[in-house]
């Protein structure tokens, strides 16, 4: 009883110090949790950018295609750029805080070599509402896009290629691990688990150095995505890609994602290729860097997934 009384009405110096430290720790934890929660909200609700094009005058004869995403995720609008009849279809999966409109030059480079190309916006990007799960549910959007295109009579339903950057790379790789229609992959700055992208988001907000901030943000993100708590890291199913050519692109100016990409490459089965670039994020490259990047991506697909036509339905 004396101990409880002393804790309630501290009179000794060490008891007062203990109570002060306890209060400090409590408020520090409370502040960290609150800030982490706010950061996660900003991460899953990124600032959206939307691009529109004049379909009648834009080069490449684009066509608007709409498709439903299962699980109540709503309708997506995509732009389809036709290539050679029966040639493979390349789906471009944009990165976090990006949009389909920022990939039009990469699209043109692929279409110029007779590939069919399709681009769309993920949830919480472009004109789409919702929140981003950093890959958990975005893979369903990629699957819905593949299903839509595979049903077209002018396309080969068995030959698809995927290109993706960070968020898009995660969704593309997750889809390829379970879909034999995916015949080639280009993965730029891919991560193994979405919580790794949360860490990147915290660090980009300048709070990565605060004690326990990354951990608190990760826990908040996992709580929001509790339904996916059993989803394994991508690296656990990489053997499903045996025989699927994959190009891993590391960007040295993004050390965190460069390291995760390197680790994924080391664990990946053959055939695999690695490209190490000084700068990443295609949409932020200068014109010369974009041309070099486009040439690398197009060359990979030309060798690994030739743009030859096949008999279609």
Language-model features: where?
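Conserved alpha/beta-hydrolase
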Residues: 107-129
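Hydrolase active-site cap/lid region
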Residues: 177-227, 239-244, 259
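An N-terminal hydrophobic leader/cap segment in hydrolases
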Residues: 13-69, 77-79
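Short beta-strand element of the alpha/beta-hydrolase
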Residues: 87-95
């Amino acid at each position: 009883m004396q101990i409880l009384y002393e804790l309630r009405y501290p009179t000794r110096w060490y008891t007062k110090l203990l109570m002060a430290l306890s209060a400090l720790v409590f408020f520090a934890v409370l502040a960290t949790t609150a800030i982490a929660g706010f950061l996660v909200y900003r991460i899953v609700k990124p600032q959206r950018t939307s691009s529109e094009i004049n379909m009648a005058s834009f080069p490449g004869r684009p066509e608007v295609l709409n498709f439903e995403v299962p699980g109540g995720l709503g309708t997506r609008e995509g732009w389809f750029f036709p290539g050679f009849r029966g040639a493979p279809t390349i789906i471009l999966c944009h990165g976090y805080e990006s949009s389909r409109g920022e990939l039009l030059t990469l699209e043109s480079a692929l279409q110029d070599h007779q590939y069919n190309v399709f681009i769309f916006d993920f949830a919480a990007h472009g004109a789409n509402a919702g929140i981003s799960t950093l890959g958990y549910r975005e893979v369903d959007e990629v699957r819905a896009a593949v299903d839509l295109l595979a049903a077209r009579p002018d396309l080969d339903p068995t030959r698809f290629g995927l290109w993706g950057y960070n968020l898009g790379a995660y969704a593309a790789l997750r889809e390829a691990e379970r879909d034999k229609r995916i015949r080639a992959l280009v993965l730029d700055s891919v991560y193994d688990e979405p919580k790794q992208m949360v860490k990147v988001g915290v660090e980009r907000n300048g709070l990565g150095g605060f004690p326990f901030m990354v951990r608190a943000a990760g826990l908040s993100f996992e709580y929001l995505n509790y339904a996916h708590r059993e989803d394994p890291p991508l690296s656990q199913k990489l053997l499903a890609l045996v025989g699927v050519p994959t190009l891993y692109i590391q960007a040295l100016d993004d050390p965190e994602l460069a390291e995760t990409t390197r680790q994924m490459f080391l664990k990946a089965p053959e055939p695999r290729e690695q490209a190490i670039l000084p700068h990443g994020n295609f949409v932020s490259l200068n014109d010369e860097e974009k041309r070099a990047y486009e040439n690398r991506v197009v060359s990979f697909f030309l060798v690994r997934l030739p743009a030859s036509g096949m008999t279609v339905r």
